[in-house]
Curated annotation (Swiss-Prot):
UniProt pathway annotation: Amino-acid biosynthesis; L-histidine biosynthesis; L-histidine from 5-phospho-alpha-D-ribose 1-diphosphate: step 1/9
GO biological process: L-histidine biosynthetic process
Biological role: Catalyzes the condensation of ATP and 5-phosphoribose 1-diphosphate to form N'-(5'-phosphoribosyl)-ATP (PR-ATP). Has a crucial role in the pathway because the rate of histidine biosynthesis seems to be controlled primarily by regulation of HisG enzymatic activity.
Listed PROSITE patterns: ATP_P_PHORIBOSYLTR (PS01316)
Keyword Nucleus: no
Record's comment describing the protein's domains: Lacks the C-terminal regulatory region which is replaced by HisZ.
Catalytic activity: 1-(5-phospho-beta-D-ribosyl)-ATP + diphosphate = 5-phospho-alpha-D-ribose 1-diphosphate + ATP
Keyword Glycosyltransferase part of the UniProt annotation: yes
Pfam families assigned: HisG
Gene assigned in the entry: hisG
GO cellular component: cytoplasm
Family per similarity comment: Belongs to the ATP phosphoribosyltransferase family. Short subfamily.
Protein name: ATP phosphoribosyltransferase
């Protein structure tokens, strides 16, 4: 059995056409189904529907053989048991700092609100900047507006939400897209099968990119 971990939303919607190129199609619509384990048209392949931030955990610990996760999630993840063989070039966005329009950055310790705590620590350590990191799980834009933080670090797509709240994108930390991740043990045990799937997905990505 080959198990693939996916998260609902944009990543799932963009991944399903790529999997279809490999003949892997869910037997029911994951967006409408309440099931978290979904069979596919290949009897020995199933999909696990999990939270986006949990995809690397399921794959590293062998609960799934493969998964699709955003690079932002992988940058924040601290595990070691993953291969990242393919950039699927889907769900593209940017990981950026943002702050109030026209605000002057304080010279002392910077207060940064984010759910990407590990990314923030690395980013500011590389700059030699002292920061206090405040972990939030959502509504990041509020933090600078009410004085909780000087800046935020978050995923930015169009930037419309930032602008609607009087914020502006500032420094680019990373360009984000979704990646195929593979469990290291699964890659050894089912190498031919998984490598064939990787090759098929790579061709599908290249074909879509050329198109």
């Amino acid at each position: 059995m080959l198990t693939i971990a996916l998260s609902k939303g944009r990543i799932l919607d963009d991944t399903l056409p790529l999997l279809a190129e490999a003949g892997i199609v869910p037997t029911e619509n994951p967006d409408k189904s309440r099931k978290l384990i979904i069979p596919t048209t290949q009897e020995d392949v199933r999909l696990l529907i999990v939270r986006a931030t949990d995809v690397p955990t399921y794959v590293e610990h062998g609960a799934a053989d493969l998964g699709v996760a955003g690079k932002d999630v992988l940058m924040e993840y601290t595990g070691q048991g993953l291969y990242e063989p393919l950039d699927l070039q889907i769900a593209q966005c940017k990981l950026m700092t943002a702050g109030k329009v026209g605000a002057v950055e304080p010279k002392g310790r910077l207060r940064v609100a984010t759910k990407f705590v590990n990314v923030a620590k690395r980013y500011y350590a590389e700059q030699g900047r002292q920061v206090d990191i405040i972990k939030l799980y959502g509504s990041m834009e509020l933090a600078p507006l009410i004085g909780l933080a000087d800046k935020i670090i978050d995923v930015v797509d169009t930037g419309n939400t930032l602008r609607a709240n009087g914020l502006e994108p500032q420094e680019l930390i990373a360009t984000i897209s979704s990646r195929l991740v593979v469990n290291k043990a699964s890659m050894k045990m089912q190498h031919a099968r998984i490598q064939a799937l990787i090759d098929t997905l790579r061709k599908a990505v290249e074909s879509r990119h050329r198109g």
